[in-house]
Amino acid sequence: MDTLAFINRALVEEGYSLKDIKLVLITDFEPSSVEAIRRLLAVNQGVSFIGRKYVKEVLEKFGLRNVRFRAVEEIPSLEFKLPESGTVKVLPFRNSPQEASAGYLLEEERILFSGKFLGSFGEKGDTIQIFHRVFFPCRNILDYNVGLLESIGEEFEVFPFYGEKQKLSAKTLKEYFNYTVKGSVLEREVILGLVNGVLLNLSDEERENLLSSIGYLAEVDDKVIVDFYTEPNLFYEEFVNTLPDAVKSKEEFYRIVEKLLEHNFYVPLRAV
């Protein structure tokens, strides 16, 4: 999807253009974001950006060194005023042990612009955050993020990175997580079956990309995993976190995730 073209169409429908954008709040950062930001700056050099510190570092590596960028980590009390009016509270989410994103609460309107943590699928009434199990597999990370949501009070409306907008509350999330976490550690043979089921249904290129990232953690024979070189649940965590980068089609990724969701796959705390 051409992100910038999509944004431009939405603006035009409301009587605006890309030149009218004053501030961009970055929740999650993907490879296509660099080019979208570059094209936006070509037509609007006055736009400012707020996001995690690593985003600025990525932009600089791609030659975008003079961008008006403010890192979340540098915002006092994690709150700031909008250029026109209103207050924004920043929620520094964690996506996994390796990654980070951010949510932005428009306090007066009780609207939360969230990343993948609160994503949902389509119109299914029971799909409270399918993505949380992909990008937030560790219980300590879930507790951390739910704690951030508890800090902003009760019910709010979520506009997620993926999926449909929805009404939500920290209490609802907490009850859901506490319920689904039960019996979450998978047996070795279950993990082998799940992982190999995914591998055998990927294209050769996708399988090669996936195994090039995590193959060092397991013994591979004829396109499948036959043994683990680490604790199976820790391998599964790495496997799940690598999937979004390896699978080319978003629809295929959705299908894989729904299949994996037939099993709880929260994992133990990573050893520090």
Swiss-Prot record:
PROSITE patterns: HTH_MERR_2 (PS50937). This is Uncharacterized HTH-type transcriptional regulator aq_603. Gene3D superfamilies: Ribonuclease Z/Hydroxyacylglutathione hydrolase-like (3.60.15.10). One of its GO terms (molecular function) is DNA binding. The keyword Transcription applies. Keywords: DNA-binding, Transcription, Transcription regulation. Residues 1-27 form the HTH merR-type domain. SUPFAM superfamilies: Metallo-hydrolase/oxidoreductase.
